[in-house]
Amino acid sequence: VFYQKDLVTKEGNPRVPKDAWVVNVVAIQRGTEFPNNFIIMSGDIDSRASNTMDFEIDAPGANDNATGMAGAIEAARVLSKYKFRHSIIYVGLSGEEQGLFGGAGLARYAQAKGWNILGVLNNDMIGNIEGVNGVIDNRSFRIFSEPVPPTESEQRRNQRRFYGGEVDGISRQLARYVHQQTKTYMPEMNPMMVYRLDRFGRGGHHRPFNDVGFPGIRIMETNENYNRQHQDIRVENGVKYGDVIEGVNFEYCKKLTAVNAITMAGIAWAPPAPTNVSIGGAVQPSTKLSWDTLPADKVAGYKIYWRDTTSPTWDYSRYVGNLGAFTLEGIVIDNYFFGVSAVDKSGNESVIVFPEKLIR
């Protein structure tokens, strides 16, 4: 456990009233085989009231975002009892309401340390079930993800015009992994993938990681209650305002914490995802895929996925064993998108990798 901090200055930051250290709390559970691979679960340790510049008024932030922080601590309590191949980080990020400063600082730190981040699960508001729209729902939740990394090359961007992949970036694959894990292990829940970086025009602490090319998503409640969000505690015209603990549903928070736990455990136990995944098959009645293989003691085999180009989820799959290439006979490349994952002997599976290279 350690503190990671950066000095944020008032100059140039309209939401910062004075120079201050933005301090994150970071706890690392080291992996046994791949300690430099990290899956991160984050909550936020800051809050705000109606006026973001008012740092003296009470701003309990029970749902936004004590719930995310409580989830990270509870996940650490549960998962720390197990050993994983990859490392897990549980982190409390600061300065989110003032400009995503904590996430930006940790993302820079990760870059400087050469961390290989497998994914960031940003939990920001995971405890409210009663929306301002009148809906009460304790089973659904949202998974926000950007389509492709902003750091991708111009060559990759041009290539996508001809070969596809507009909705298949690394963060979108991470979102699909969360969706699939939930459907498999928590079928009572209804995960909603939202094809958007975050809520309309808004931001969260996964974005600074996305900005530098790391996969990251936001996990949160489906129905927000704006009367309880960024509000001074008060009563107006019979309406209660303020983010207090009475607005938190602990059973729901527990469910979304479990979603994080099964996602992190799945990734942290699984083999590393395939690398150099390539595809070919133009004007042929079959699709060819290839990838770099891991040593036999690190992986049991590989699984090829495909889906209709309009489908949000991977709907078809075939386990092909411990091979480095495979041809799907009778599957025309034009009609589907494809991906490859790595699987261990216990069935733990990596995030699916979309091909970014061509077989000539």
Q: For the regions a protein language model found, what residue spans apply to each?
A:
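Short beta-strand segments within Ig-like beta-sandwich modules, predominantly Fibronectin type-III
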Residues: 316-323
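Alpha-helical metal-binding/catalytic segments enriched in His/Glu/Asp
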Residues: 27, 41, 46-47, 52-100, ...
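Metal-dependent peptidase/peptidase-like ectodomains
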Residues: 93-204
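A non-catalytic alpha/beta surface segment that caps or lines the substrate-entry region
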Residues: 1-30
